[in-house]
């Protein structure tokens, strides 16, 4: 039976589900190869866990990620969390886990902060409309 690892990552309203399996080092986000993923900032952010884990680990894996919701940066952060969790679960290596945690804790832990809702009496969550006394 083929070993397949499913992992997930979240950031704001973006949710990413990664499938890690034995392969040739292909990484796809929504069926698009990582090399062709735009914008470049998001591609670089997603490739961080791959660079930290090392080429010897990643070259033997195929990673397919399905990401929904949120914006570009939120999706990129959700994908990198899902990929990092999948690599850690696949390798069962504490040194890789420690390297991820030392680099950025959000590689392993989802960032659950949400946008604060707008309230009445103002243009946003905290600010109020200007008050006039005369």
UniProtKB/Swiss-Prot annotation:
Claim: Ribosomal protein is one of the keywords in the record: yes
Keywords: Ribonucleoprotein, Ribosomal protein
Highest taxon, organism lineage: Archaea
Pfam families for the chain: Ribosomal_S9
One annotated GO biological process: translation
Location of the region described as Disordered in the Swiss-Prot/TrEMBL record: 114-134
Single GO MF annotation: RNA binding
Keyword Magnesium (UniProt): no
Annotated Gene Ontology cellular component terms: cytosolic small ribosomal subunit
InterPro entries per record: Ribosomal_Su5_D2-typ_SF, Ribosomal_uS9, Ribosomal_uS9_archaeal, Ribosomal_uS9_CS, Ribsml_uS5_D2-typ_fold_subgr
Homology family: Belongs to the universal ribosomal protein uS9 family.
Descriptive protein name: Small ribosomal subunit protein uS9
Organism per entry: Methanosarcina mazei (strain ATCC BAA-159 / DSM 3647 / Goe1 / Go1 / JCM 11833 / OCM 88) (Methanosarcina frisia)
């Amino acid at each position: 039976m083929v070993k397949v690892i499913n992992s997930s990552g979240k950031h704001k309203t973006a949710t990413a589900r990664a499938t890690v399996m034995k392969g040739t080092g292909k990484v796809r986000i929504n069926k698009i190869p990582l090399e062709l993923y735009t914008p470049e900032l998001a591609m670089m952010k997603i490739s961080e866990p791959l660079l930290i884990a090392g080429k010897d680990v990643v070259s033997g894996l195929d990673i397919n990620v399905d990401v929904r919701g949120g914006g570009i940066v939120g999706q990129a952060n959700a994908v990198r969390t899902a990929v990092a969790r999948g690599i850690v679960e696949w390798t069962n290596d504490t040194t890789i886990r420690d390297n991820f945690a030392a680099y950025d804790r959000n590689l392993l832990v989802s960032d659950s902060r949400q946008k604060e809702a707008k309230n009445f009496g103002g243009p946003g969550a905290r600010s109020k409309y200007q008050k006039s006394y005369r």
